[in-house]
């Protein structure tokens, strides 16, 4: 019984260069490059224009790592070819953001401003003062930076003020019932 996800082949798009050296996997594409150490018990090989990830045995932990490794490798190949992005909206009177060097300075109703500097490989864009776009080749890093920005002022359920993902729907609550 193999991992359902792990046994799917990964197609290598045109313009992406893949190298496998033992347990080290590296992908290079138009948007950048990324590398990953494949876990013990799992091997990857290139056959034609596909990457095949296989488990060395049928033990439960190996099957779990098999699916994980295949998903991460597929995310890397997509990331170096297309890149990943997450869009956040800033909702609330007086809440805004402005570029400061490579980082962004947020005014979120606190007594001070908050500056967020992106890690290596992540870029922050500001199409307007109420929208932030996080871009990069690493899916996990893009999601983590977006989550850290959202955490600065999470949306509250009464008026919906705060930083939310663009596709997120905030569950609203009714206020106190008047007499």
Curated annotation (Swiss-Prot):
One of its GO terms (cellular component) is cytosolic large ribosomal subunit. Keywords: Ribonucleoprotein, Ribosomal protein, RNA-binding, rRNA-binding. GO terms for molecular function: rRNA binding; structural constituent of ribosome. It comes from the Bacteria. Transmembrane segments: none annotated. The keyword Acetylation does not apply. GO terms for biological process: cytoplasmic translation. Part of the 50S ribosomal subunit. This protein binds to the 23S rRNA, and is important in its secondary structure. It is located near the subunit interface in the base of the L7/L12 stalk, and near the tRNA binding site of the peptidyltransferase center. Belongs to the universal ribosomal protein uL6 family. This is Large ribosomal subunit protein uL6. It comes from Bifidobacterium animalis subsp. lactis (strain AD011). The gene is rplF.
């Amino acid at each position: 019984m193999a991992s359902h996800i792990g046994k799917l082949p990964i197609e290598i798009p045109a313009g992406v260069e893949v190298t496998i050296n033992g347990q080290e996997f590296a992908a290079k594409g138009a948007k950048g490059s990324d590398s990953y150490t494949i876990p013990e018990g799992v091997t990857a090989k290139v056959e034609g224009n596909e990457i095949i990830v296989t488990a060395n045995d049928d033990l439960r932990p190996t099957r779990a790592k098999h699916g994980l490794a295949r998903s991460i490798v597929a995310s890397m190949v997509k990331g170096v070819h297309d890149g990943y992005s997450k869009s956040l909206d800033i909702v609330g009177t007086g809440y805004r953001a402005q570029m400061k060097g490579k980082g962004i300075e947020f005014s979120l109703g606190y007594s001070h401003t908050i500056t967020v500097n992106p890690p290596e490989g992540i870029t922050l864009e500001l199409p307007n003062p109420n929208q932030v776009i996080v871009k990069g080749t690493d899916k996990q890093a893009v999601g983590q930076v977006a989550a850290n920005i959202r955490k600065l002022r999470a949306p509250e359920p009464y008026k919906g003020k705060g930083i939310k993902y663009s596709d997120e729907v905030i569950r609203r609550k009714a206020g106190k019932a008047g007499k």
